[in-house]
Curated annotation (Swiss-Prot):
Name of this chain's protein: Transcription factor Sp9
Source taxon at top rank: Eukaryota
Biased composition (Basic and acidic residues): 413-422
Predominant cellular place of this UniProt entry's protein: nucleus
Keywords associated with the record: DNA-binding, Metal-binding, Nucleus, Repeat, Transcription, Transcription regulation, Zinc, Zinc-finger
Keyword hit for Coiled coil: no
Biological process according to GO: embryonic limb morphogenesis; embryonic pectoral fin morphogenesis; positive regulation of fibroblast growth factor receptor signaling pathway
Zinc fingers, C2H2-type class: 295-319, 325-349, 355-377
Family: Belongs to the Sp1 C2H2-type zinc-finger protein family.
Region (Disordered) location: 372-422
């Protein structure tokens, strides 16, 4: 047997790789008595990585790491007639040998001089051993931290293992964002980009930055993926679709409504006074009420009528006691119901006297004071009307008083609230 062994290839019994393989084989052996002949015979035979063994390696109970080991035939231990051959196998080693597993892991894929048939057989054998080894540890998703690197030649799936949060490459098809679906995500991103581009060009940079990051989004766990196409659906409504009917409806209203009443009363009533509510209730039959343009006070016992809704609102403030107009003169701060009352009050601060007597050229701040003065010249003649006209000219045109003859209904006493001075 020694002659046949010496006649073969050069010996590698003294190399560190052979010593490591012998140690691994010694630990993997079940009989402690056969370890010494095995190591001595292996030292004589050498380590031949290009030959294949006829027996497989036994798998121990502790799997600290994987190393390259050699297996001897059982006949070489007793008879000594069979030649010693070596092959690749995965043997269980001590935890200290796991440091050498990554160094010699390249021999799985870069062994020189291996025929296609032998390489196919070796890969099938290794995949079977690896599947049985992973079955012992169903709780661990990966047998080694760098398993995805040195297992480039074959792939095995752990059926009972739960993938950890860092196990990105082993994610199943149940995850909603995968690396393989990058093209689909980019396609959906382009569709959303087209929809947003039709609305406004300001969203183009947003969609580009959001969907261009999907290539790197697989590095995040499943709970951290926040930018999806569904997230944009409830946020951005379809403005172009709803904008078309709105514009067309507005154009149709402008073209169809020729009269002022058609534009004004096309929707709800613009005023809540009794006259407007009655016209709204009658519909087309209330066109006569709309043409009059009269807005009456709804307070019982008042019955005043105004030609503009703004005038009616100013009158209603007198009922409610609201005083929105404030004097901004220093240390004054008085509040008034109407703007003309505020203007008349400001003349008391400035000392302006707008109304002059046509007889004696005496000037007055208020028109009613001028009216009383003219009565002294005429002996109580028709000076009152002149003072009333002057007061009307002095008042603000935005909120005219209700003493206008054409807006007063019968039975309403004129000048009811005209003589109050604030």
């Amino acid at each position: 047997m020694a002659t046949s062994i010496l006649g073969e290839e050069p010996r590698f019994g003294t190399t560190p790789l052979a010593m490591l393989a012998a140690t691994c084989n010694k630990i993997g052996n079940t009989s402690p008595l056969s370890s010494l002949p095995e190591s001595s015979a292996f030292a004589k035979g050498g380590f031949h990585p290009w030959k294949r063994s006829s027996s497989s390696c036994s798998l121990g109970s502790s799997l600290g790491g994987f190393a390259v080991a050699t297996s001897r035939a059982s006949g070489a231990l007793t008879g000594g007639t069979a030649t010693a051959n070596s092959a690749f196998c995965l043997a269980s080693t001590s935890p200290t040998s796991s440091a050498f597993s990554s160094d010699y892991s390249g021999l799985f894929s870069s062994a020189s001089g291996v025929s296609p048939q032998e390489s196919a057989g070796q890969s099938a054998f290794i995949s079977k051993v690896h599947a049985s080894a992973e079955g012992l540890y169903p709780r661990v998703g990966m047998a080694h931290p760098y398993e995805s690197w040195y297992k480039s030649g074959f792939h095995s799936d752990v059926s009972g293992g739960a993938s950890a949060w860092w196990d990105v490459h082993a994610a199943g098809p149940s995850t909603w964002l995968e690396v393989q679906n990058t093209q689909g995500a980019l396609h959906s991103g382009a569709a959303a980009h087209g929809q947003l581009g039709a609305y406004s060009p300001d969203f183009s940079s947003l969609t580009h930055s959001a969907f261009s990051s999907t290539g790197a989004s697989h590095l995040l766990p499943g709970g951290q993926h926040l930018l999806t196409q569904d997230a944009f659906k409830p946020v951005l409504p379809s403005y172009p679709d709803s904008g078309g009917p709105m514009l067309s409806g507005a154009a149709g209203t402008g073209a169809g409504g020729t009269g002022r009443s058609a534009r004004r009363y096309s929707g709800r009533a613009t005023c809540d006074c009794p006259n407007c509510q009655e016209a709204e209730r009658l519909g087309p039959a209330g066109a006569s009420l709309r043409r009059k343009g009269l807005h009456s006070c709804h307070i019982p016992g008042c019955g005043k009528v105004y030609g503009k809704t703004s005038h009616l609102k100013a009158h209603l403030r007198w009922h409610t006691g609201e005083r929105p107009f404030v004097c901004n003169w220093l240390f004054c701060g008085k509040r008034f119901t109407r703007s003309d009352e505020l203007q008349r009050h400001l003349r008391t601060h400035t000392g302006e006297k707008r109304f002059a007597c046509p007889v004696c050229n005496k000037r007055f701040m208020r028109s009613d004071h001028l009216s009383k003065h003219i009565k002294t010249h005429n002996g109580g003649g028709g000076g009152g009307k002149k003072g009333s006209d002057s007061d009307t000219d002095a008042s603000n045109l935005e909120t005219p008083r209700s003493e206008s003859p054409e807006l007063i209904m019968e039975g309403v006493r004129p000048g009811k609230d005209s003589g109050n001075d604030s």
